[in-house]
Amino acid sequence: MNIKIIVVGKLKEKYLKQGIAEYSKRLSKFCKFQIIEVPDEKAPESLSDAQMNEVKVKEGERILGKIKDRDYVFTLEIKGKERSSEELSAEMAKLATYGNSDITFVIGGSLGLSDAVMKRSNSAISFGRFTLPHQLMRLVLTEQIYRSFMIQAGSPYHK
């Protein structure tokens, strides 16, 4: 199985890099895992709606350029469907069973995802209604992917 997370922007915080590196190492036993960073679009503090949309479109084009036709795409969206860890694990296992071995998760930039990226999505997921920094979300998502494999393996890690 190939799993990738496509994210907008660079990760700077050392403690987040260390956490992601730990889970990436653990994931290597179950899948080929990678995080792909695409550049964020530089924008002034206050933007009109049209300017915000332009930023999302440019970032969206970069994201879409990293998605392959065969990829099953989960986008992280505020209005996405909330899932438990068990539900995400079952969904990933079902995808693998039915031949979807290339899974991509997408975390947008600070303004969110473009309409084109959301349209490409096979499934929109949400980690709740609260807002998390995009950098922290990388770690949370990476841990949940690892947890999904642990649930499938019947490991006590999930308890």
Curated annotation (Swiss-Prot):
This is Ribosomal RNA large subunit methyltransferase H. The lineage of its organism: Bacteria, Bacillati, Bacillota, Bacilli, Lactobacillales. GO terms for cellular component: cytoplasm. One of its GO terms (molecular function) is rRNA (pseudouridine-N3-)-methyltransferase activity. S-adenosyl-L-methionine binds at L76, G108. The gene is rlmH. Specifically methylates the pseudouridine at position 1915 (m3Psi1915) in 23S rRNA. Its EC number is 2.1.1.177. PANTHER family: METHYLTRANSFERASE, RIBOSOMAL RNA LARGE SUBUNIT METHYLTRANSFERASE H. It is an enzyme of class 2 (transferase). Keywords: Cytoplasm, Methyltransferase, rRNA processing, S-adenosyl-L-methionine, Transferase. Belongs to the RNA methyltransferase RlmH family. It comes from Pediococcus pentosaceus (strain ATCC 25745 / CCUG 21536 / LMG 10740 / 183-1w). Pfam families: SPOUT_MTase. It catalyses: pseudouridine(1915) in 23S rRNA + S-adenosyl-L-methionine = N(3)-methylpseudouridine(1915) in 23S rRNA + S-adenosyl-L-homocysteine + H(+). NCBIfam families: PRK00103.1-3, tRNA_RlmH_YbeA. CDD domains: RlmH-like. Homodimer. It is found in: Cytoplasm. Its main location: cytoplasm.
